Structures are given as structure tokens and as C-alpha cells.
Regions:
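Conserved AMP-binding/adenylation subdomain of ANL enzymes
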Residues: 85, 191-207, 215-255, 269
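Conserved ATP/PPi-binding loop(s) of AMP-dependent carboxylate-activating enzymes
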Residues: 335-339, 350-383, 421-423
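Gly/Ser/Thr-rich phosphate-binding loop
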Residues: 228, 253-258, 267-328, 341
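AMP-binding/adenylate-forming catalytic core of the ANL superfamily
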Residues: 96, 113, 248, 256-259, ...
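Conserved AMP-binding A3 loop
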Residues: 39-41, 168-192
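Conserved AMP-binding/adenylate-forming
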Residues: 10, 36, 51-96, 422
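Conserved pre-ATP/AMP-binding loop-to-beta segment of ANL
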Residues: 9-11, 26, 153-172, 179, ...
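Conserved structural elements of the adenylate-forming
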Residues: 44-49, 164, 183-204, 211, ...
Length: 484
């Protein structure tokens, strides 16, 4: 049948699979959030109706469509529909400031913005240009609700299969106050992740619990394979430990992706051991350092496999630690996955011999097409070998042991990872030094039980009587939520 044949291809059509699952298992659950649930028939029909009107509005092949709001079913439908229509999904970071969001939107080149009421209010007064605004839920003013804006039932759209090089999505880097970097992922890159790398992990019976935002690549690493293989995904609007445990037990969740701070909150929750989590097949973790002690606790008390994924949104090398198979390697991030190559470079970009400590650098079939509109930034990430092959530098200092397991021992990049999000100290230092009372500033990451790391600023003042609280309030007012 079409689905089995398509999933066996080295490159296939993700959008066509969404429609095919609607025919293959029309009455099976596909999506759920806190207020509703959709079958695969309903998902296939709704995404077709959205795709049809996007094309009628003039959406060009590969053109971005921006999405901004709390993760829920309408958000997921738009994401899937954009891909089915031949567009490029551009989810925007909800924690960003209005100015940052405006910069992302402009950079994306989108002519449509799907948004919820709360984020639309945040954008009041922000110039977005000639854009069609559609509300993800209820209509606001002249902006129609998604349910009313969709094309008529049975509407058809041009479902020409994508090329492997066509853009699938743009993921905007978090934690920067300057021009955002839009990381472009191609259909070929995503297909390799969804149908290639995860072929043996996901199937039509998968039940995933999604508790991180849909604008994050962390989330897509589970959400997209679940959809590709015809499974079921419950989307949480906001992570809450007790609600997560309730959903996991009720839905008999099989797959999930969490960042370390979420694992910590779950494992320390007083009710954790009272829940039946025996349905779990695999739990993933990525985006931030995952303490060996926490991994051990998860292995001991939470049924199912535990897999740590190390890599960048930009791609390059991906390492996986199957912690349940290698309990003596919990201090590492695992080994490069099949088809991924890893080398180590010194500070001058010279290749180092095996066993050396240096900048982890990799290449694989899952590499970004580049940063949108920023070729110079793309080149800064790249390293070329003698044969002209492109490798991507992670910015992490690491070492590979005799068994091929990778340990992270530091960073070459000046970056703080807080709650799974990247924060660049230089950006914060520039804002602090722009304050009239500040002559010099330094920002460092401090250990945090709640977030892993949190940024702390140190300043030299022109006047000892200046108020640090006032400076802090002004600077935080210019930062996104995750940067404060």
C-alpha cells in the first residue's frame, strides 16, 4: 500500500502521508489538546482545507508561513497544512519580545501570520507590513478565526510532491537580542529524521505526549515522526508535572521528549511513584546537559528506555545514548548515530588525533540548508575537509573515549543553556552597557536547580548610588522571557 511503500523510500512525501493516514485509519485518534480531540480523518480534511486557501491566497512553493501562539491543535493543523501546501513552516518563539518577533517575521518573508489573541496583543503597534493575519482560535476584529477562514469542505489543493532541497521549516534561534538566525531545514533533512532514523522507533500505534513548544526543534523531533507514522500526539499548552503524569497514565503514552529540567520536576514530584507509567517504550531527552545522577534516577523509577540525544538545531553530528543499554556510560552523551561522522578540531580548526580534547565537529544527512538571509553566519559554522566536504562545528569541547562514547567537557562558544534554551551573554552585556549608569558589564551562567543554568550580570557603575534594581527592570523589559 502507499503508506508502507512511501515510508520505505530514501526520500518521500510527508504531506501526502498526512492525507493517506486519514484514509487508512480515519476514526483513530490523531491529535488532542486540553479542549478537543481530532481523528485522522479530521486532521487530513482540516489540513487540506487550510492548504487550499493558502494556495488561493498566493502562497508560493517554499514560501514561509509564520505561526505564533500557544501549542495546541489549531497550531499543529496549520503547521501540517503549510507543509502539505508546499510552503515552509516558520514557528516564532512565544518568549521573544515584540521587536524580536518583528525581526523574525520580516526575515522569514512570510505573507501569512497565524496567531493567538495573547500574542496578537503583544504585537500591537509593531509594523509587520502587508500580512494576512488569521487567528488560531477566535476571531479578533477584522482578523478571522482559522475555523471560519478555511476553504470549503472537499476543497482541493496542488499536492505536487516536494523536492528534497525544498524548505520544510525555519527554526529561529533563541536567546539573541540581535538579528535572529533562521535555521532552514529541508524536506530531505526532515525525511531522514522522520522515516529514516526513527523507522524502528515509531509506528501507527505510537502515542506521544508533547509538552515542549511546537516552535522548538526539540518538540519536532517527536511530533513530526509521530505524525509521519500515523500515531497519536497529545499536545500540552504548558508543561505541568502533575498534568503530564495524568495524561501519560490516561493515554498510556509510549513516547515523549523532555528537557532535563522537566525530568527533574517530574522525578521530584511527590506523586510520581503513584502513577502507572508502564506503557512507555522510550523517553527522549535533549537541549541541555543531563546529569548522570538524574539519568540513573529515571532508569530506576520510570519504565521504558531512556535515550539522550546530543546535537544542534543546525544539524551536523547527532549522538545518542541509549542509557538503558549503557548504564555505565551515563556521564556521556552517547555515540554518533549511523551515518553521522564526528571529528575533533583545535582552536585553529586543525583536525586532532583520536582521543584528543577539542571542538566537536560533524557531518551527516541531517544538516541545515543554512541560516536564512545570513550566508556569512552560515560560513562561520562550517569547516571543510581536504575533499571539500562541509562539516558543522558544534561549539562544544568534547572528547571521545576508546568505546566511541562522547563526553562534553566545556564550550568554545560563549553561551548559557537555561531550561533548554540558548542565551548569548554578549547580547545581554551589550544591553547592560547601554544603560547610562553602567560602564562595564559581564554576564555568566550560574548553576540553577530549576533551569540548569541562569544568567547573572555583574556591572561596574558610574555612580555607587545607582539602583541595580532599576537597571535590572529596564534591561529585562527589553529581553525575551527565556533571556531574563
Amino acid at each position: 500500500m502507499f503508506i508502507d511503500t512511501e515510508l520505505e523510500k530514501s526520500f518521500g512525501d510527508f504531506g501526502a502521508l498526512i492525507g493517506a493516514w486519514g484514509e487508512e485509519k480515519p476514526d483513530a485518534r490523531a491529535l488532542a489538546d486540553s479542549s478537543s480531540e481530532l481523528t485522522w480523518r479530521e486532521v487530513a480534511q482540516a489540513t487540506a482545507r487550510i492548504a487550499a486557501v493558502l494556495q488561493r491566497d498566493g502562497l508560493q512553493r517554499g514560501q514561509a508561513v509564520a505561526i505564533l501562539g500557544t501549542s495546541n491543535i489549531p497550531y499543529a493543523l496549520v503547521y501540517l497544512a503549510v507543509v502539505r501546501a508546499g510552503g515552509c513552516a516558520a514557528p516564532l518563539t512565544t518568549s521573544a519580545t515584540p521587536a524580536q518577533l518583528a525581526a523574525m517575521f520580516k526575515d522569514s518573508g512570510a505573507m501569512h501570520l497565524f496567531v493567538d489573541a495573547a500574542k496578537l496583543a503583544d504585537l500591537e503597534g509593531v509594523a509587520l507590513g502587508n500580512v494576512k493575519i488569521v487567528m488560531l482560535e477566535n476571531a479578533v476584529g477584522d482578523h478571522p478565526a482559522l475555523a471560519d477562514w478555511m476553504a470549503e469542505e472537499g476543497a482541493r489543493f496542488d499536492a505536487t510532491p516536494p523536492a528534497a532541497t525544498d524548505p520544510f521549516n525555519i527554526i529561529y534561534s533563541s536567546g539573541t537580542t540581535g538579528t535572529p538566525k533562521g535555521i532552514i531545514h529541508s524536506h530531505g533533512m526532515r525525511w531522514h529524521q522522520m522515516a529514516g532514523g526513527f523507522k524502528s522507533i515509531y509506528n501507527r500505534d505510537t502515542r506521544s505526549l508533547v509538552s515542549t513548544p511546537l516552535y522548538s526543534n526539540t518538540t519536532l523531533a517527536v511530533f513530526l515522526p509521530t505524525m509521519c507514522h500515523g500515531g497519536f500526539a497529545r499536545i500540552m499548552e504548558k508543561f505541568d508535572a502533575l498534568a503530564y503524569l495524568d495524561h501519560a497514565q490516561t493515554d498510556q503514552t509510549t513516547h515523549t521528549m523532555l528537557v532535563p529540567v522537566q525530568y527533574a520536576r517530574l522525578m521530584t514530584h511527590a506523586e510520581f511513584d503513584h502513577y502507572d507509567l508502564s506503557s512507555f517504550i522510550v523517553k527522549f531527552c535533549t537541549s541541555a546537559p543531563f546529569a548522570a545522577e538524574l539519568k540513573a534516577d529515571v532508569l530506576q523509577r520510570w519504565p521504558g528506555g531512556l535515550v539522550e540525544i546530543y546535537g544542534m538545531t543546525e544539524g551536523g553530528v547527532v549522538c545518542m545514548l541509549q542509557a538503558h543499554h549503557h548504564p555505565n556510560k551515563l556521564h556521556t552523551v552517547g555515540q554518533p548515530v549511523t551515518g553521522h561522522e564526528l571529528i575533533v578540531l583545535d582552536e585553529d580548526d586543525n583536525r586532532l588525533p583520536a582521543g584528543s580534547k577539542g571542538v566537536l565537529t560533524g557531518r551527516s544527512p541531517t544538516m541545515m540548508s543554512g541560516y536564512k538571509n545570513q550566508p556569512e553566519k552560515t560560513r562561520e559554522m562550517e569547516w571543510r575537509d581536504a575533499d571539500g566536504n562541509i562539516w558543522l562545528k558544534t561549539g562544544d569541547i568534547g572528547i571521545v573515549d576508546a568505546d566511541g562514547f562522547v563526553s562534553i567537557v566545556g564550550r568554545a562558544k560563549d553561551m548559557i543553556i537555561s531550561g533548554g534554551f540558548n542565551i548569548y551573554p554578549k547580547d545581554l552585556e551589550e544591553l547592560l552597557e547601554a544603560q547610562p549608569e553602567v560602564t562595564e558589564a559581564a554576564v555568566v551562567g550560574m548553576p540553577s536547580e530549576a533551569w540548569g543554568e541562569t544568567p547573572v550580570g555583574f556591572v561596574r557603575l558610574t555612580d555607587a548610588a545607582a539602583s541595580p534594581d532599576s537597571i535590572l527592570a529596564r534591561v529585562n523589559g527589553q529581553l525575551g522571557k527565556t533571556q531574563r
